[in-house]
């Protein structure tokens, strides 16, 4: 395992992070007084409070794991497996998908299809007919795995984190798991839908969501 690293970062546009404390510090009130309340001076003081500037580019040696052919719909498990392997764990993508990340099959009735909220569990079967899961479910799966390995690392969902938070994590040697779209195209809703087990509300999934590691 990589020495000196206490947390793993998983992230999405929904986002997940192994560790916390990545928010930039707010600008101290004294900084405004010292600069005469000028915007340029306050901005300069705020940037200085963030620490050293981030590099333009960072290349991390993340292991490559292919989701195909076993899991055509298993990008979340594949991305998490790559992240765990980066930290020195002998993670297997099929085990991560079926033993650790929460998963729930669909139930079919005469009138409706019922399924999980992707925030809480993977919807369907990643090897067959499945959709996706979101950051909370992936973080839960990661923490199940880490606990079983007696690791001090923990995954934290940081959905909504801004670009600076993600870039700083990568610059510190911590890759992130993010949700994007296939080809980075605009989000598209699927024609398929189901009712949630939790409250019977109708859920319309995205058609082109994709999970990857950055």
Locations of the language-model features?
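Active-site-adjacent substructure of cysteine-protease-like catalytic cores
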Residues: 160-213
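Mid-length scaffold segments of soluble, non-membrane domains
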Residues: 125-164, 168-172
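Structural recognition of the beta-strand scaffold that forms the well-ordered cores
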Residues: 74-76, 154-156, 175-180
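Short secondary-structure junctions and interdomain/linker hinges
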Residues: 103, 149, 176-177
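Active-site-adjacent structural segments surrounding the nucleophilic cysteine of cysteine proteases
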Residues: 4-7, 14-140, 192
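Generic hydrophobic secondary-structure signal
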Residues: 10, 80-84, 96, 138, ...
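Residue-level marker of positions within ordered structural domains that often coincide
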Residues: 80, 147, 183
């Amino acid at each position: 395992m990589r020495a000196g690293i206490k947390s793993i970062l998983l992230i999405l546009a929904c986002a997940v992070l192994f560790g916390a404390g990545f928010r930039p510090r707010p600008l101290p009130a004294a900084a405004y007084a010292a600069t005469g309340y000028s915007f340029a001076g306050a901005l300069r003081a705020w940037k200085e409070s963030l620490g050293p500037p981030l590099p333009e580019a960072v290349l991390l040696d993340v292991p490559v794991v292919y989701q195909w052919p076993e899991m055509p719909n298993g990008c979340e498990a594949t991305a998490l497996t790559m992240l765990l392997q980066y930290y020195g764990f002998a993670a297997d993508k099929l085990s991560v998908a079926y033993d650790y990340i929460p998963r729930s099959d669909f139930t079919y009735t005469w009138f409706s299809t019922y399924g999980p909220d992707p925030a809480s569990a993977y919807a369907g079967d990643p090897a067959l007919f499945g959709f996706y899961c979101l950051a909370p479910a992936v973080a839960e799966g990661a923490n199940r795995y880490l606990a079983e390995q007696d690791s001090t690392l923990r995954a934290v969902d940081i959905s909504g984190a801004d670009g600076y938070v993600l870039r700083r994590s990568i610059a510190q040697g911590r890759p992130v798991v993010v949700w994007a779209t296939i080809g980075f195209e605009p989000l598209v809703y699927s024609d398929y839908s189901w009712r949630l087990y939790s409250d019977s509300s109708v859920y319309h999934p995205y058609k082109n969501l994709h999970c990857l590691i950055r």
